[in-house]
Amino acid sequence: MAAAAAVIPPSGLDDGVSRARGEGAGEAVVERGPGAAYHMFVVMEDLVEKLKLLRYEEELLRKSNLKPPSRHYFALPTNPGEQFYMFCTLAAWLINKTGRAFEQPQEYDDPNATISNILSELRSFGRTADFPPSKLKSGYGEQVCYVLDCLAEEALKYIGFTWKRPSYPVEELEEETVPEDDAELTLSKVDEEFVEEETDNEENFIDLNVLKAQTYRLDTNESAKQEDILESTTDAAEWSLEVERVLPQLKVTIRTDNKDWRIHVDQMHQHKSGIESALKETKGFLDKLHNEISRTLEKIGSREKYINNQLEHLVQEYRGAQAQLSEARERYQQGNGGVTERTRLLSEVTEELEKVKQEMEEKGSSMTDGTPLVKIKQSLTKLKQETVQMDIRIGVVEHTLLQSKLKEKCNMTRDMHAAVTPESAIGFY
């Protein structure tokens, strides 16, 4: 049904839900029927229609950049996080549509506080919420559909929306075209159904005034033409031919209407008689099958007891073997743990041994290798050569020093003789 066409919601479904939830403080909870599990799909479809009436696509989805939910969005689990966010967003928007200020929840808000605020607003409208708040955390289920449906109804009441009765279109029957010679006059009965609160019966009234006027005109014409009718000028053969030609057109065929309740009643009686006749034949077979199944189940039960009694000692042995197996497994686990520890220690010792071997090999190779001795000999030879060169240089230096000292001594002696000779000459003169 389109969103613009407002119809009356089925009150029986709403009553069934309220009875199933146990509305009221002292009202006892009524046992739910087999179709109660699928009732939330109906509530979800009604909720989508109510949201369309509230223009949620233009005012909410486009502004918040959200995709429209499907007709069973909150009835089936798809993505709990996304469904819970969509539920909180719709609930906040519906509460704002009722004229009350409610802050739009964000993703980082506490979900428990958000649910508590929504339920408190729902209870302020006089609605009951006798289910745990954790049912709304999943974002889907009967409780989620119930809360959103109640808020949508309150929003419709606030904007002054009223439900109207549905208007059914009148179906026009197609007229059949038949040949002129073999034509039959077909009268189709069109029933116009008017929904009234006082009565459900339908009556057809005949306009007696019209019939009376037609009869009066016929009597007047007959009285005016009495003189012409006194003498007949019609040929009997032509009259018979005309009667044979017009007779097929005078046949009236009443077309059966599938909407007629009498046809459905007849069908119900036929089905009832068929079911009763079939039940008489099948009841014996079903009783026989039931008895055979009961006897078979009794035999199976007795056989199970006999087998259990016969195999009781084997079961005890099996249990003992299971206990021994568990003990052996525990011992194996303990031994396996010790082996693992010893394997680790062995790997550490092996690693240290490899290191010692490597060091010994390095030292042995260094001891047996003659390269260092050759280098030492070469160094000693070089040192000797350098020592000889130093000795030669020292001798040259000593010789040079000795020559310089001797030369200096000679010079001093000569100077001394030169100084003594003039003094003696002066004394001589």
Curated annotation (Swiss-Prot):
It is found in: Cell projection, Cilium; Cytoplasm, Cytoskeleton, Cilium basal body; Golgi apparatus. Present in retina and testis. In brain, it is present in the cortex, striatum, globus pallidus, hypothalamus and cerebellum. Present at high level in neurons and neuropil throughout the brain (at protein level). Expressed in hippocampal neurons, where it colocalizes with HOMER1 at postsynaptic regions. Pfam families: IFT57. Disruption phenotype: Mice show randomization of the embryo turning process and heart looping, which are hallmarks of defective left-right (LR) axis patterning. Motile monocilia normally present at the surface of the embryonic node, and proposed to initiate the break in LR symmetry, are absent. Furthermore, defects in central nervous system development are observed. The Sonic hedgehog (Shh) pathway is down-regulated in the neural tube, resulting in failure to establish ventral neural cell fate. The keyword Transcription regulation applies. Keywords: Apoptosis, Cell projection, Cilium, Coiled coil, Cytoplasm, Cytoskeleton, DNA-binding, Golgi apparatus, Transcription, Transcription regulation. One of its GO terms (cellular component) is ciliary basal body. The pseudo DED region (pDED) mediates the interaction with HIP1. Required for the formation of cilia. Plays an indirect role in sonic hedgehog signaling, cilia being required for all activity of the hedgehog pathway. Has pro-apoptotic function via its interaction with HIP1, leading to recruit caspase-8 (CASP8) and trigger apoptosis. Has the ability to bind DNA sequence motif 5'-AAAGACATG-3' present in the promoter of caspase genes such as CASP1, CASP8 and CASP10, suggesting that it may act as a transcription regulator; however the relevance of such function remains unclear. This is Intraflagellar transport protein 57 homolog.
